[in-house]
Amino acid sequence: MATTKSFLILIVMILATTSSTFASLEEMVTVLSIDGGGIKGIIPGTILEFLEGQLQKMDNNADARLADYFDVIGGTSTGGLLTAMITTPNENNRPFAAANEIVPFYFEHGPHIFNSSTGQFFGPKYDGKYLMQVLQEKLGETRVHQALTEVAISSFDIKTNKPVIFTKSNLAKSPELDAKMYDICYSAAAAPTYFPPHYFATNTINGDKYEFNLVDGAVATVADPALLSVSVATRRAQEDPAFASIRSLNYKKMLLLSLGTGTTSEFDKTHTAEETAKWGALQWMLVIQQMTEAASSYMTDYYLSTVFQDLHSQNNYLRVQENALTGTTTKADDASEANMELLAQVGENLLKKPVSKDNPETYEEALKRFAKLLSDRKKLRANKASY
């Protein structure tokens, strides 16, 4: 009798724990963040293709898209372009691009976007005309409010000297931010010295003209927009019941996937104090943006990994980054076919690498684990909605 009673107690405990786990997963807020990096967007593009493929297999649904699983998708520079590609609706109100179309997009359009023959000696390296043309062609007249999930795309206004963050949740208070997606994507990609800044105008809530003079959001030290994307999610928690579980910065209730575009540790791409002691403004100008982007990405990852670890939720945060780019793969604008092939291979090889020295789990295994959580959470929410 005592044995039977103990067995029943054990069953109840297991069921209670399982129920609690499901409830916890259902409450999770999911965030995807994609770094800037020009043509190196091929690397996160490869990772996104793998992740979406896993979700399609798990849910037995070839039409499954990343926007169906993430509450917030954020990006800077080329990451902003990827964000738009996987969240902007087509005529069927589905993302106009599947993840497996991202890398082919770079191969088709990259050589024309980064065409050195269009550059000017006393001006931006590229005129940006083809980039704008292809953005208008792909994104049409869609605006921020039409995105299929919350987005966070960053840029920097050189007239007001302030960052500009385009999100759906800001539109009620700031309707002037409901810009066309092609204007936003060009602005996010308009890195100083590479592309001209972008001017466009919208209307305020009173109907007044509102002007933007924008460059790449990485200028606002958000080359890694993960923290920005998390901030958008936590701000929504104050108003949206679907985000309520992360009020008071409860990162235990958040799943965060952050995709990098690669960094380098090559000696000839870094510098010593002795070497730079006599540098002037021109020499510093050529490398300062790269340095600040690398520093901001490192600090963002350091902060987030520390916070998640302190909350014993380190498995809720995954940073996918290649830290050993070499040769031409370090360049944001080398769109030669040979280099793009190398970047695609970097992405494929990255899947087989361990997450860190302390974590032997490969990125492929970690992404499969993430995909399972995303899939289960979506099913739990769908079941709840059906009642």
From Swiss-Prot:
Name of the protein in question: Patatin group A-2
Q: In which tissues is it expressed?
A: Tuber and stolon.
Q: Record's domain comment? A: The nitrogen atoms of the two glycine residues in the GGXR motif define the oxyanion hole, and stabilize the oxyanion that forms during the nucleophilic attack by the catalytic serine during substrate cleavage.
Q: Provide a GO CC annotation, any one.
A: vacuole
Which InterPro entries does the entry link to? Acyl_Trfase/lysoPLipase, PNPLA_dom
Q: What is its EC number?
A: 3.1.1.-
* UniProt keyword list: Coiled coil, Glycoprotein, Hydrolase, Lipid degradation, Lipid metabolism, Plant defense, Signal, Storage protein, Vacuole
Where in the cell does this protein reside?
Vacuole
The molecular function terms of the Gene Ontology recorded here are: monoacylglycerol lipase activity; nutrient reservoir activity; phospholipase activity
Question: Position of motif GXSXG?
Answer: 75-79
This chain's function reads: Probable lipolytic acyl hydrolase (LAH), an activity which is thought to be involved in the response of tubers to pathogens.
In its miscellaneous comment, the UniProt entry states: Patatin have a dual role as a somatic storage protein and as an enzyme involved in host resistance.
- Specify the taxonomic lineage: Eukaryota, Viridiplantae, Streptophyta, Embryophyta, Tracheophyta
Signal peptide range equals 1-23
The record places the motif (GXGXXG) at 36-41
Return the motif ranges for DGA/G.
216-218
Q: Which residues form a coiled coil?
A: 361-385
Does Aminoacyl-tRNA synthetase count among this protein's keywords?
no
In terms of PROSITE patterns, this protein maps to: PNPLA
Q: Which GO terms describe its biological process?
A: defense response; lipid catabolic process
